[in-house]
Amino acid sequence: MQFIDQARISVRGGRGGDGIVAFRREKYVPAGGPSGGDGGQGADVVLEADSNLQTLLDFKYKRLFAGIDGRRGGPNRCTGASGPPLVIKVPCGTEVRHLSTGIVLGDLTTHEERLTVAFGGRGGLGNAHYLSNRNRAPEKCTEGRDGEEWPLQLELKLLAEVGIIGLPNAGKSTLISVLSAARPKIADYPFTTLIPNLGVVRRPTGDGTVFADIPGLIAGAAQGAGLGHDFLRHIERTRLLIHLVDGGAEDPLLDLRVVEKELEAYGHGLVERPRILVINKQELIQEEDLDAIVSALTEASGRTPLLVSAAMNRGLDDMLDRVWSELGI
């Protein structure tokens, strides 16, 4: 499945139906009064969160969504039928912005949560509204009004409690695959992960906690370099970050600083987010280098790193104990 996490669409509420001019034409009522009915209300356009959807892919192929127009009024003061709401399904975690102003209109995070993004136009008035002492047979009615029309920006931000971050090839996909039932593509080269991967990790209570493996960041990610710029938004909702550092890298300290710099540059409070520092690929670290690497990372980050090997399933229980403790579980 192709992962699309941004989309631009246009929404337009239905036009209100027109009011009509009509007069009573009944037996024994030779000069009936005005009886023109009002037009129906145009359809609203509504976004609805659906937990069964994982991507905004559908909006790649259809970008204009218009509600049904209201029906015109009828004789005998009959109001025209209103257009039923046009309901558009989006994934849970979709943030909706007005494209022109950037104003956030809503944030759909729970299943079946709804947001009206364009109201339909009001129906026009029939001539029955214009009866007066001076005008007993009004010929006046009004047209229905146009519905609202707006350009919108949809942004999907994954709903995960724990985000796994780090440079490309730090072992994030291997870690999430070992911890959960997720099966991301894994290989020994940078940028294997091109989309965020979600995995559910069982808590001690038996409930599940969603972990997100965020595609690798590189220097300049917050300004658009590499893959990180498009996916940093997915860790905005997380409660906790696992910062994974490749223990077998040429310079683990430099790798640490690159990611921390990108979190700070991106903003949105990410640099203050609770974080666990984890050195992965413990098996690749020479025994004589281990203390120096741990000491350097501790001094630079102010955090004592945990040592794990995702590939060999070492140290992961201790890491999860820290995760549950940080989350208050």
From Swiss-Prot:
Single GO molecular function: GTPase activity
Cofactor: Mg(2+)
SUPFAM superfamilies in UniProt: Obg GTP-binding protein N-terminal domain, P-loop containing nucleoside triphosphate hydrolases
Domain Obg span(s) in chain numbering: 1-159
One Gene Ontology term, aspect cellular component: cytoplasm
GO terms under biological process: ribosome biogenesis
Keywords carried by this UniProt record: ATP-binding, Cytoplasm, GTP-binding, Hydrolase, Magnesium, Metal-binding, Nucleotide-binding
Annotated Mg(2+) binding sites: 173, 193
E.C. no: 3.6.5.-
Self-association and partners: Monomer.
Homology family: Belongs to the TRAFAC class OBG-HflX-like GTPase superfamily. OBG GTPase family.
Entry function: An essential GTPase which binds GTP, GDP and possibly (p)ppGpp with moderate affinity, with high nucleotide exchange rates and a fairly low GTP hydrolysis rate. Plays a role in control of the cell cycle, stress response, ribosome biogenesis and in those bacteria that undergo differentiation, in morphogenesis control.
Protein name: GTPase Obg
Organism whose genome encodes this protein: Synechococcus sp. (strain CC9311)
Lineage, opening ranks: Bacteria, Bacillati, Cyanobacteriota, Cyanophyceae, Synechococcales
